[in-house]
Each structure stands twice: as C-alpha cells, then as structure tokens.
C-alpha cells in the first residue's frame, strides 16, 4: 500500500500576458515621424492623412505633427497627423 495519499493535480493555473494593444498617442498630442499611435488587431481605426499601416495593423505617424482622431461616415474612425503650426 502507498504510504502517501495520491494527490490530484489541477489542469488550470495558466494565463497569458496581455498584448498591450490600444492607443499610444492621444488626440492633440505631438508626434514625430515613426511614432506608434495605435496598436490593434484588424482595422478598428483606419489610417488617415500622414499615417501609415503596419503589417500587424499598427498605425504610425509618417510626419512630425499633431494627432487628430476623426470619423469616417457613420460607424468608422480614422486617425490623421497634421503638421503643427
């Protein structure tokens, strides 16, 4: 006979870290060319003027300027960068 009681093991107890998605630069904030503005899965927010779209759908500034979030029609959003005056 076993001299220790058999102890079951749980198959839970794991969780992956978050992916740090979301807004990195907010409306009205100054950005330099190459600064990441928004990290996302899919085009939740579309690229507007002077904003590039990375292969993982990251939005980034193409010029130095100020961030502005805008609406595209009824249900879509875009982010643009306009030169600071």
From Swiss-Prot:
GO MF annotation terms: structural constituent of ribosome
Coiled coil: none
One biological process term in Gene Ontology: translation
Entry keyword NAD: no
A GO term from the CC aspect: cytosolic large ribosomal subunit
Region of interest: Disordered: 1-21
Name of the featured protein: Large ribosomal subunit protein bL27
Family: Belongs to the bacterial ribosomal protein bL27 family.
PANTHER family: LARGE RIBOSOMAL SUBUNIT PROTEIN BL27M, RIBOSOMAL PROTEIN L27
Keywords (A to Z) from UniProt: Ribonucleoprotein, Ribosomal protein
Organism: Citrifermentans bemidjiense (strain ATCC BAA-1014 / DSM 16622 / JCM 12645 / Bem)
